[in-house]
Amino acid sequence: MLKTPLYESHMAANAKMVDFSGWSMPINYGSQIQEHNNVREDCGIFDVSHMLAVDIQGSEAEKFLRYLLANDVAKLQENKAQYGCMLNHDAGIVDDLITYKVTDEHFRIVVNAGNRESDVAWFNQNAQNFDVAITPQTDLAIVAVQGPKAVAVIKRVVTKEIATEIEALLPFSFKFFSKWMVARTGYTGEDGFEVILPATQVKKFWDSLLENGAQPAGLGARDTLRLEAGMHLYGADMDTSTTPLERGLGWSVDLSDEHRDFIGKKAYFAKKAQGVDTKWVGVVLKTKGVLRAGQEIDFDNGEKGYITSGSFSPTLKVAIGLAYVPKQADNPVVNIRGKELEVELVKPKFVKNGKSLI
C-alpha cells in the first residue's frame, strides 16, 4: 500500500489507518466527532498528500486547459483558483478538481487520489496537439489547515512577513513562497488553507502546526465536514456515468464563450436541451436513524430517488445526505430496517462557517 510522507507521524499518533484508493490513510486519531467539531470550532489539520498536484506549463497551457476543462480558465487572474469538472466526450465527469493559475503559461491542477493515474493519462492523451508540458509533482506533500482559527495557527509557524501575506489571501487565492504554495481553499465549509510543499519539509511543518494549537483530523471527519458543506465526493456523488447537470454542478460549466470548444461540450448541450428529470438535493432525516449511500427515497407517486452520500451530522445532530430525486414528487420517505421514515428535502448545503443553513 502507498504511504504519504506523514505515515510515521500518523502511526505515532495512534491513528486508525485504512486503505483509501490504495493509500494507507488515517480515518481518525481516536474520536471522529471530536475531530469534526474541532475543525468547526478551532483548527484541524489533514494530511491530503494522497492527492496529486500536476503542473501544466507551456505557451499553450491556457489554450489546452480551455479545451480540457468545462469551466473556463480564461476567466482566471494570476494567483487565483477555480473549481471545475473535467468531462469525457459524453459529458460524463472524469474528475472534479481545482485549477490554480500561476502565470499565463503555468497552471497547477490538484486531482483526486483515486484518479491520479487516470487523470494524468487523460491529460497526456488530450495534450498531443498543444505546446504544453505535463509534470506530476510526486515529490510534493499537501496539508489542509482548516477551521476558524486556521489563520491564527498558521501565523504562528511562519515568519511575520509571510504571515501578513497569508492572512491577506482571499478565498480561492494563493501565493508561492519559494517552493511552498499556500491557497485559501478547502473541503470543509470553514476558513482555511491548503499548503503544497516539498515532501522533505512536511513533517517539520506538521509538527509545528501541532505544537501551535492545531489538532490532527482524519478522513472520517473530512467526509462529514464536506458532506455538511454540500461538497461532492468523486466516485460517490458523481462519476463518468453522470453529467454536471444531474449533480447540481451546471454552474461550473462555462458556456459564455460560444466559440470555445471543450471536451464534452456537444454532449453537454444535447443533455441540456433534452432536460434532466432529476434534481440534486440535500436530505434531512426527521427522526433517529442513519442515512447511507445507496438508500432509496420513495415518493407517494411511486417514483424513487437515491442517496449518494449520507452520514450523521455532528454539527446539526441529525442524519443528512446528498441525493438525486424526481423533479416532481411529494412526501419522501426512506426505508431503514423495515420502517418508513420521513425525510425533508432541502438545498444541498447544510453548514457554512459553523452555522446551520437549514
UniProtKB/Swiss-Prot annotation:
SUPFAM superfamilies: Aminomethyltransferase beta-barrel domain, Folate-binding domain. The keyword Nucleotide-binding does not apply. Belongs to the GcvT family. InterPro entries: GCS_T (IPR006223), GCS_T_bac (IPR022903), GCST_C (IPR013977), GCV_T_N (IPR006222), GcvT/YgfZ/DmdA (IPR028896), GcvT/YgfZ_C (IPR029043), TrmE/GcvT_dom1 (IPR027266). It holds the Pfam family GCV_T_C. Keywords: Aminotransferase, Transferase. One of its GO terms (biological process) is glycine decarboxylation via glycine cleavage system. It comes from Francisella tularensis subsp. tularensis (strain SCHU S4 / Schu 4). The keyword Transferase applies. Its EC number is 2.1.2.10. The gene is gcvT. This is Aminomethyltransferase. One of its GO terms (cellular component) is cytosol.
